[in-house]
Amino acid sequence: LKTLGLCLSFAGWMYWFKRWLRVDFCFVPAAVFSAASVAVYFGGILFRLEYAAWLVYAGGLAAFAAAAAFSLARRARPAVHLGLREICFGIGCAVFLSILPGAHFQHYDNFSHWGIVVKLMLSTNAFPTAQSGLIDFLNYPLGTSSFLYYVCYYAGRREGTMLLAQGILIFAFFYAVLGAVRHTRCFLLYALLGAGLSLLSFFNITIRINNLLVDFLLPVIALACWAVIRRYPTDPEKMLPLLLPYQALLL
């Protein structure tokens, strides 16, 4: 039930974010995930990590309930139109992400830092400190770790759940890159972008998708920022609210 609630919470935030900004839905999931990560991160800085996770979760559920009531009252159309772009992208995501729920950590850095950090956050509901003997590297920011903590707090603490959360975050920014295409009927451009992103994932031998390293995520976020700027170069009311959470997570 908590996992279902997590999905509904994200859906609630996405609905109102899309309705508020009126942007291409490609940019919305990454913006919501980034904003949730930053909110949980600031909660951790204020020593209220668990409270921040509950606040984001409860706020999303309230947003979903309000969205459902609003849609039923006004018989509004769905916020997302499932076109060929969404169907093909969803199939591609399913292919890549289907292996992750039962996967295990393999890369050394998962055991020396990233996986240990998230496990420690889930155990203590707090950020690690300089006195945490399990953490070898103390200079890495905890932006993506905050997102993994938030998802795993409700969806489970297995390694596969952490890897799935990381994969969903990566593909949310992949999806945002598709928003660079202004003409939604130019399927060939979407196909070329999708093929390029798929090849990046497939041939990235050093940093596979079954690890928590951010080395692959950071350039994808940068590409998503480029896509926003290219799509809305003269519309700061749409560009800035999207770039703010993207770049906050990037930093």
Descriptions of predicted regions:
Residues 21-31, 161, 177-203:
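Transmembrane-helix signature of polytopic, membrane-embedded enzymes
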Residues 44, 192-220, 224, 228:
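Aromatic- and kink-enriched transmembrane "portal" helix at the membrane-lumen/periplasm boundary
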Residues 183-186, 222-240:
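Membrane-interface transmembrane helices that cradle and orient dolichyl/undecaprenyl
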